[in-house]
Amino acid sequence: MDSASRSTSSLASSSSSRSGSVADIKMDDNASVDSGFASASSSTSSLPLVSFTHAHLKHLNSQLETMQPMDILRFCKVLFPNLYQTTAFGLTGLVTVDMLSKLQAQTPGMQPTELIFLDTLYHFQETHDLVERVKARYNVPVHIFKPAEVNTTAEFEAMYGEKLYELSSELYDWIAKVEPQQRAYSELNVAAVLTGRRRSQGGQRGDIPVIEIDEERGIVKINPLVNWSFREVKAYVDEHKVPYNALLDQGYKSVGDWHSTVPVGEGEDERAGRWKGQNKTECGIHNKKSRYAEFLQRQEAQKVSA
């Protein structure tokens, strides 16, 4: 059996016991979720913790657009319950961690914003080293979520085969990133998340607002540094001596999995080193959930017909 067949077989055979199984995914895809928007006919018993009308969200974004990131964070800390930061410990996320630490120092009674880190099992060792340095520096809880039922790269490859990221990048993204993220949101009861996305990163991020609603997942996403350039982010890191990934001193600018990240050349975009030569700009966690539900429904059909 080749690696691609083995990975599909493993997914099907473990679906009955795994959190976020194929059957669960199908049910989740068909179930209704709170979008974060409220209408005049909404029942108060069914409203999510945070709800907006479209007009209210538009107004908030118009006001936040001109605010500094620290002020956006201060505002969001007050407005959103169950607020977390999801991060791969890139520069923008690290700036956010540092700013939140400063806000915490100003208001000691304020609940700290805890971090969510998706350990794909294919991160660089330098990234794992950075996680430990951030935990030591900022004394902030880091919730680490790995692919279901595996703890090491060897276990992952025994279940799904070697180089799944090459054989089926969509399946890899689901198993290593999207499902663990979904599990994190559910287990931690996340209502809103801070992200490290910025418009200057280009691609699908070129026109994102400060606050957006992920209607499929039923959460609010906040992009506090949306207006900053890479130069501004790096200047903050240098000025405030924020710990950063050692790979940035070796020509990297955006760091993901080791199998899909390379240094960038002079004048290349910040994220040019991610998925080099592929028609891809996002790892999956910011793509629509339905994109993966459709894929997994095909896997379920294959399992039934087998």
Put a short name on every predicted segment.
Residues 2-306:
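Nucleotide-activated chemistry modules centered on ATP-dependent adenylation/adenylyltransferase
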